[in-house]
Structure formats: C-alpha cells, structure tokens
C-alpha cells in the first residue's frame, strides 16, 4: 500500500476535535447573544462582554462552601487595623472622584486602599442612585461584601438616611441576588449588624445622663422622627428582606 493510501487516524482525530470545539464555541456564543438580547443590554460593550464571557460557568455552592474565604486584598474582611484619615484630608480627594462606570469606580476604589473611611465616604457621597447606575449590569465579585463591611464599620451618626439610600441602590443592581448568595460569614454578620444599627437609629433615642439638655434634644429628635418613622421603618423592613436579614 502506498503512503498516500495510508489513513492518518491521529490527524483525523485532531481535525475532528477541532471541529467539535469550533461547533461548541459557535453554539455557546450564539446562545449568549440571544441571552444578551433578552436581557436588553444598554450598550454594545455589554453585549460583547456577555458573548466573550460565554465560556465561563457560575460557581456552585459546593465549590466555595468547603474552604474558608481568603481575601488578602480586602483589609476590612481580614480585620486589619489601620489609621483612617480625617474628613478634612479626604474631602478634596473625593471631590475629584466622579466615576460613571463600573471600571472607573473600581479604579478609584483601589486608590483608596489605605483607609476604609475614605471608601465609606466615597459610597455615601455617590449615593444609592449613582451606584445603581454604575453597577446596572452587576457588582464586581467581592465588592458587595466589602461595601457591607465598610458601611457597618464606619457608619456615622447622621448618615443613616444616606446609608439606607446606598443599600437601596445596591439592592437594585444587576445580579444582586447572586452577589448576595456569595457573601462570606463575616460579611453576612456585618450586614446584620449594619441593619441593626440603622433600625436602632430610626426607632430609639439614647440620652446622656450628664447632659442637662438631654430631654429637650430627645423630645425634638423624636418629634422629627415621628413624621418619617413609618416611611423609614417600612424602607428598612423591605431592604432587610432583600438582604436576608429580616427575622
């Protein structure tokens, strides 16, 4: 038998394997295109990103439940102690930060790696509506948990309404339920602690025994709160349900 008549099975196997891979890729990307159209993405960039990421598979709970979560890039989750800058030092920097997309936000977020107070101030200054627009597609992996840790750790008196607005905006972002299901134990506890703080601030007044004007201040505060108490309580209850902290 001549060499030209010999069948090269190895070569045929490689060609068949390549053809199968190309067919799978076509089917996968085609399905991703229809999925992107059904989601009514806002831009071609989002459409392209969904198609390019079509080969990625979502994590199963079994993939993450067996081992502790390690986030060396997240000093708050690791309970790292460091000195926060004062508001006077932070404010000039925050005035220059106006991210309009998720990529711009992440870039600016990483610049504030030295102090959680700076990140807290950034979240509060942007507000829930802006954050909802920035993360309309989804919040980056790990960011939601970091947001909750920072908001719980750095919550300041007087910021309760604005923080509630931030939580409301984040709850309306894309794939929120998926990001919520990926929270670590520490992040879930921080979320519960944050809602407890907000509920206490909305419904209680804590007087100082040595302050002679305490009763007047508390009475004025309670009078002001009575007008908005129902709305605030309802909003917090709805948000607690979305974040899974409602008992």
Curated annotation (Swiss-Prot):
Induction: Expression is regulated by foxj1. It is found in: Cytoplasm; Cell projection, Cilium, Flagellum. Expressed in all cells bearing motile cilia. One of its GO terms (biological process) is cilium assembly. One of its GO terms (cellular component) is outer dynein arm. It holds the Pfam family Dynein_attach_N. Residues 12-32 form a coiled coil. Homodimer. Belongs to the DNAAF19/PR46b family. This is Dynein axonemal assembly factor 19. It comes from Danio rerio.
């Amino acid at each position: 038998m001549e060499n030209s008549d010999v069948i090269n099975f190895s070569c045929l196997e490689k060609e068949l394997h390549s053809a199968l891979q190309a067919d799978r890729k076509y089917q996968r990307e085609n399905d991703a295109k229809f999925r992107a159209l059904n989601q009514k993405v806002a831009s071609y960039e989002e459409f392209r990103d969904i198609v390019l990421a079509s080969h990625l598979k979502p994590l199963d709970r079994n993939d993450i439940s067996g081992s502790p979560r390690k986030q060396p890039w997240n000093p708050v989750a690791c309970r790292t102690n460091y000195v926060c800058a004062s508001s006077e030092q932070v404010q000039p920097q925050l005035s220059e930060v106006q991210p309009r997309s998720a990529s711009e936000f992440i870039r600016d977020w990483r610049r504030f790696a030295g102090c959680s107070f700076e990140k807290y101030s950034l979240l509060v200054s942007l507000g829930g509506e802006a954050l909802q627009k920035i993360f309309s597609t989804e919040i980056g992996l790990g960011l939601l948990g970091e947001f909750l840790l920072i908001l719980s750790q750095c919550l300041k008196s007087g910021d309760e309404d604005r923080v509630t607005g931030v939580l409301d905006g984040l709850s309306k972002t894309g794939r929120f339920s998926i990001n919520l299901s990926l929270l670590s134990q520490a992040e879930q506890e921080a979320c519960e602690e944050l809602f407890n703080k907000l509920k206490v601030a909305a419904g209680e007044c804590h007087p100082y025994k040595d302050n002679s004007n305490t009763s007047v201040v508390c009475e004025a505060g309670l009078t002001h709160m009575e007008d908005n108490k129902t709305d605030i309580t309802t909003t917090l209850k709805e948000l607690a349900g979305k974040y899974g902290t409602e008992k």
